[in-house]
């Protein structure tokens, strides 16, 4: 859980690979925002899709925002933009704590676990190390149960909510 009264800013990176970036609604991060709000955490949502000067818009918002915790979602094609976003964020807010969730880290984590179980250091291990160097916390799997622990001081580098043995794993009975 974030500190009492601490604002969390959730960021949707642009999808520059799409002809119309507003075609797909990003529901996962909005559900995460709802969980935070329900827990009494002040939330900002910054949707950078369709914004040509998205880095300047982000920097402007980050300079004025009371948030110290910034969470991003990213699909694999959004990762280059998410990388630019986190780099720009760190330029103007070196105090920021960054969290990455979404489909990309979920898939990278699954491939990483497989490679490690086989004793391999392949593309997934390289990708995981790169993400670990860019973000403070990585959330694999659904973020609804993982966001509060991810925002807590001293959160682990990886929160694996994609592991069926994890209490954060959302099975069909708990998926709402």
Report residues per predicted region.
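Acidic, low-complexity intrinsically disordered segments
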Residues: 2-176
């Amino acid at each position: 859980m974030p500190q009492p009264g601490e604002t969390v800013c959730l960021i949707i990176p642009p999808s520059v690979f799409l002809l119309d970036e507003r075609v797909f609604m990003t529901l996962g991060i909005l559900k995460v925002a709802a969980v935070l709000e329900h827990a009494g955490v002040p939330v900002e949502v910054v949707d950078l899709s369709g914004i040509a000067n998205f880095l300047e818009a982000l920097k402007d918002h980050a300079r004025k925002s009371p948030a110290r915790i910034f969470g991003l979602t990213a699909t694999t094609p959004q990762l280059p933009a998410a990388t630019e976003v986190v780099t720009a964020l760190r330029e103007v807010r070196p105090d920021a704590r960054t969290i990455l969730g979404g489909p990309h880290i979920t898939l990278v984590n699954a491939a990483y676990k497989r490679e490690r179980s086989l004793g391999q250091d392949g593309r997934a291990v390289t990708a995981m190390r790169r993400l670990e160097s860019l973000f403070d916390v990585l959330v694999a799997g659904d973020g609804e149960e993982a966001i509060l622990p991810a925002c807590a001081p001293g959160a682990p580098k990886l929160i694996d909510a994609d592991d069926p043995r994890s209490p954060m794993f959302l099975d069909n009975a708990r998926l709402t």
